[in-house]
Amino acid sequence: MCRHVAWLGAPRSLADLVLDPPQGLLVQSYAPRRQKHGLMNADGWGAGFFDDEGVARRWRSDKPLWGDASFASVAPALRSRCVLAAVRSATIGMPIEPSASAPFSDGQWLLSHNGLVDRGVLPLTGAAESTVDSAIVAALIFSRGLDALGATIAEVGELDPNARLNILAANGSRLLATTWGDTLSVLHRPDGVVLASEPYDDDPGWSDIPDRHLVDVRDAHVVVTPL
């Protein structure tokens, strides 16, 4: 399991999104409020953003977010219109390595998977960045295309009825997300939109997304449809 968050809007620093909120990913790495599976997220973290040329950049680690002084020192200076970050709680038996931490990428999209799926139902692919289930799910989604995200998640969910398949993806101008077994909330701000596993503050504007839904964010417009 993990906790993830994404931003699409006016330029925002990674510190402002990930480290500074009173219940942001930094706090969620050791004291999440809404996490249904696992007690903390200390098995790695990752942050990705799109630079001014639209190139996806990533920083991933297999260490707890709270112990990364280097990231804390540069995060205030890293600003982007589109950011995706996650903290990881590794499934028992899965490797703990930087390549197992989200966000995964195909060069155009950044993607995080919050959940669990039986790797036996997933097609084997050499494109996966790690042997963990999340990396294989990401590779499958990339191969099918993000426009088919809803159909892909519904198919995997049918193959593994116990799967939890909360996906969060970003390409610099669009956010996509699914709810399938875990929580997701949305916050509309005057300068952009946040999608997050759980609210990172007590702003009354947060709204919960129902389970088994697809979320599509473009140009500050949020469309939510059933899966």
Swiss-Prot record:
Domain of life assignment: Bacteria
PROSITE patterns on file: GATASE_TYPE_2
Enzyme class (EC, first level): hydrolase
Active site (record annotation): C2 (nucleophile)
InterPro entries: EgtC, EgtC-like, EgtC_Actinobacteria, Gamma-glu_amide_hydrolase, GATase_2_dom, Ntn_hydrolases_N
Catalytic reactions on record: gamma-L-glutamyl-hercynylcysteine S-oxide + H2O = S-(hercyn-2-yl)-L-cysteine S-oxide + L-glutamate
Function: Catalyzes the hydrolysis of the gamma-glutamyl amide bond of hercynyl-gamma-L-glutamyl-L-cysteine sulfoxide to produce hercynylcysteine sulfoxide, a step in the biosynthesis pathway of ergothioneine.
Protein name: Gamma-glutamyl-hercynylcysteine sulfoxide hydrolase
Organism: Mycolicibacterium smegmatis (strain ATCC 700084 / mc(2)155)
Gene: egtC
